[in-house]
Amino acid sequence: MHTMATALTLEPTALPSDAIEVGRIADAWGLQGWFKVQPYSADPEALFSCKRWYLQPAARGAKAFGGTVLLPIRQAKDHGGMVLAWAQDIDDRNTAEALRGARIFVPRSSFPSPPPGEYYWVDLIGLQVINRQGLALGQVRELRATGAQTLLVLAHEQDGKAGKRMIPFVPAFVDQVELPQKRIIVDWQPDY
């Protein structure tokens, strides 16, 4: 049986500049070193497609490692809203438990391409939003799922004061998403 020393074989590394936090290790699963991951997305495809995860220690509790480490993934699969994963050199329950709470990052460049007309939210954050008349409405700060639709939450300035504007991210209001130009064109007015 492996001991905590196994966890120390994780390779210290720098976090890639395009790293996106995609989940956290929830707990060990079984006796063979598998562990459960709580993904931050309803579609955890990035966890399945990337075979090199970057871990950072849990914010609270015991830490089995310090700084950022590289975790090569042998296998990852869906498990009812969670992801089960098995990593290189993690071969028993104790070692898997030592990773509990670790934050998981993957490079944005390793995400699979979304279907046409679909976007990763992370790619929309920071884009400028302008209307059909060319008026700047603000910059995307976050996206909010409301059940019926997703909202673009924009930061903007009006009369020298910081403000917030929300626009439904639906085809009726969004004309174009131009990622290379870092902008979204909408059918919306500032007084809506």
From Swiss-Prot:
Keyword match rRNA processing: yes
Record carries keyword rRNA processing: yes
Range of residues in the leader sequence: none
GO cellular component: cytoplasm; ribosome
Protein name: Ribosome maturation factor RimM
Record's keyword terms, sorted: Chaperone, Cytoplasm, Ribosome biogenesis, rRNA processing
Family listed: Belongs to the RimM family.
Organism (species): Verminephrobacter eiseniae (strain EF01-2)
Coiled coil, from the record: none
